[in-house]
C-alpha cells in the first residue's frame, strides 16, 4: 500500500511544505471583469490581487478545479505507484471542489480515492492535510486516517471578520444574512463557519471590538481542549492580523501553538477587503 495526500489550492500551504511532502495541488481560479483569469498558484501575488480587486467594477468570480484536472492528478499518482489518495477539499458549503474531487475519484480505475470535506478553508483546511501526512508516515491505513480527520473536525473551526458583506452576498457564500441587510451601517460583522457554511454570528460597532470578539469566542471554545493549534489568517489589512498574532503569542498558555498565515485569492475574493480569520484545531498539528 502506498498513500498520497493531495488538496486543492485553498489550503494555502507554503511552497516549502508542498515540496517537502510532495503534495499535489488542484488549483482553483479567479476571473476579473476584464476577462483575465488566474489560477491560484504563482500566477498572481496576493498584493496584486487585492489591488486589482479594488479597482474592478465587479467582484471577481471563482472556479473550482474541473473534474478533468482531478482525474489527471489521480492518474499521475496512480502511475507513480500510489494505491490510495487522501484528498482534502475546501468546504462543500462554499465550493464544489469536494464534489468534483469525489466524482473524479469514481471515474479513475486502479487507485482508491478518499475525498474528505474539510468544511473549512485556508490554513485550517491545510491542518487536515498536514495531519493526514503525519498519519501516512506513521503507517495508518486510509480509512483510519479519514476516521481521525472526521473526529478532528468536531474540534476544529474558524471565526471571521470582514469590512462588509458585499462580496460574500454577491458570491452567494454566506447563509442567513438576509436579516442583516441594511443594518450594518457603521457596524462590523463577525462571522463563523458552521457545518461548512459561513453564517453571521454577531455585529459590533468597531473593527477593534470585532477583533476582540473574534479572539474571545475562539479562546472560550478551546479553553478546555487538551491540545490547541490557533491560526491567525490575514487579509489585506496587514497590521490587524500581525497585531492579533503577536497578542495571542504573548497571552495564550504556553501549551498553545499559535501560527500565522494569509488568505489567497479565491477566499479573498469571497471575503472582500478587511478579511481576518482566527481558526482553531483541538490538536497540536505538525506545521513543518
UniProtKB/Swiss-Prot annotation:
PROSITE patterns: DEGV. Keywords: Lipid-binding. GO terms for molecular function: lipid binding. Hexadecanoate binds at residues 62, 95. It comes from the Bacteria. PANTHER family: DEGV DOMAIN-CONTAINING PROTEIN DR_1986-RELATED, FATTY ACID-BINDING PROTEIN TM_1468. This is DegV domain-containing protein. It comes from Staphylococcus aureus.
